[in-house]
From Swiss-Prot:
Name of this chain's protein: Lipoprotein-releasing system ATP-binding protein LolD
GO molecular function: ATP binding; ATP hydrolysis activity; transmembrane transporter activity
Subunit structure: The complex is composed of two ATP-binding proteins (LolD) and two transmembrane proteins (LolC and LolE).
Record SUPFAM superfamilies: P-loop containing nucleoside triphosphate hydrolases (SSF52540)
A Pfam family it matches: ABC_tran
Chief location: membrane
Subcellular locations according to the entry: Cell inner membrane
EC class name: translocase
Entry's EC annotation: 7.6.2.-
Organism: Geobacter metallireducens (strain ATCC 53774 / DSM 7210 / GS-15)
Membrane topology, as annotated: Peripheral membrane protein
Superkingdom field: Bacteria
One CC-aspect GO term: plasma membrane
PANTHER family, sorted: IMPORT ATP-BINDING PROTEIN, LIPOPROTEIN-RELEASING SYSTEM ATP-BINDING PROTEIN LOLD
Length: 225
């Protein structure tokens, strides 16, 4: 497999002088195309910070992130935002669905923002909702869905622009064990069908065990890979 993402000598710190806190300390990590990775470790070890920098939601203090060989943080803000929107999908612990819109409309939203006509956006959104097992919930609003269903809508929305990389930050953190298993099965299914590269931050050891690779962080450093 060829390399999709390379993290090189990455550091992230906050503050300065005696108040400086170093969250990431010289991270090196290569992610291959089509790979599935779990980032694990105790709370406060820098897992979510690393994921956010990999997804260009935050910038490193030093080091680089290369996507397809390009140092993405050399891009200007507008170019970086465009790259992020089309190349990376995100799923968070909370679904962040828009409550006034239906499941179908929520999944269509990234396409509409990207300038796709409403008539053209419906079909791919409907197809993805079918893939995550929600073909019967197209017209339901988030408040009418269970927690697991809400998260599956969020997964569909994250994939609707066909990103190469899907990043998930504690996607089952608010769910019970049975529902967590359903969300995991959904992630596995879309990975197999679409070949999307998947990186997950999780405390769920069962979920981590299903990933192809586990990367463990301790005190801002990779200690096992």
């Amino acid at each position: 497999m060829s390399s999709l993402l390379e993290v090189m000598d990455l550091t992230k710190g906050y503050g300065s002088g005696e108040t400086r806190v170093d969250v990431l300390k010289g991270i090196n990590l290569t992610v291959a195309e089509g790979e599935t990775i779990a980032l694990v470790g105790a709370s406060g070890t820098g897992k979510s910070t690393l994921l956010h920098i990999m997804g260009t939601l935050d910038r490193p203090t030093s080091g680089s992130v290369r996507f397809g060989g390009e140092d993405v943080f050399r891009l200007g803000d507008a170019a970086l935002a465009s790259f992020r929107n089309h190349s990376i999908g995100f799923v968070f612990q909370f679904h962040h669905l828009l409550p006034e819109f239906t499941a179908l409309e929520n999944v269509m939203m990234p396409l509409l923002i990207a300038g796709v006509k409403r008539s053209d956006a419906a079909a791919p959104a409907r197809e993805l909702l079918g893939e995550v097992g929600l073909a019967h919930r197209l017209t339901h609003k988030p408040g009418e869905l269970s927690g697991g269903e809400q998260q599956r809508v969020a997964i569909a929305r994250a994939l609707v622009l066909s990103p190469k990389l899907l990043l998930a930050d504690e996607p089952t953190g608010n769910l019970d064990m049975k529902t967590s298993d359903e969300v995991h099965e959904t992630l596995e299914r879309v990975h197999r069908k679409r070949g999307v590269t998947l990186v997950i931050v999780t405390h769920n050891e069962k979920l981590a065990s299903y990933m192809g690779r586990t990367v463990r962080l301790v005190d801002g450093r990779v200690v096992a890979d």
